[in-house]
């Protein structure tokens, strides 16, 4: 995601999150929840017009607790807008807003055979705790391919820290049932290099409500 390199530092030891998602404000019923949390990789799914999705999560690490919120809204076919914020509370300190991100997600290709689905994500990041370069912009290209039934591979390549670093992710996702799924993921930034990995489980309570649990370092 947009704050990948910051996440590497923030979760240098461990991460435990639980995310809740709520579905559509429109009359549509054919769309299932496909979250962009809690992993670092951007998926290729884009919300249909007038659909609102709320993604909320809480987490903990060796240095702080945090709470993140993402609002996703389908603007027109193949395009959604997102607003994401992160509140952080150090173990010794006050609650503070560490990141605020406005982003757009554009579906480029839905995928066909062995040609993967492709989505382009653009970010405008505001980091009030940074002394310099508080406002930055980044881009990410997301690719997703189903390998066999129930098993998919998602890869991201993009920029980080205002186009100053390269970010890469690779994620394998597996659906055990229609409701229960899992993922294992590598993520990293380069220049200089930092690496991490995480894994998680997701369970669809209903078609419009999903909970997830993840951990990593």
Q: What would you call each of these model-derived segments?
A:
Residues 1-34:
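Cleavable N-terminal export/targeting peptides
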Residues 27-217:
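Transmembrane beta-barrel domains of Gram-negative outer membranes and organellar outer membranes
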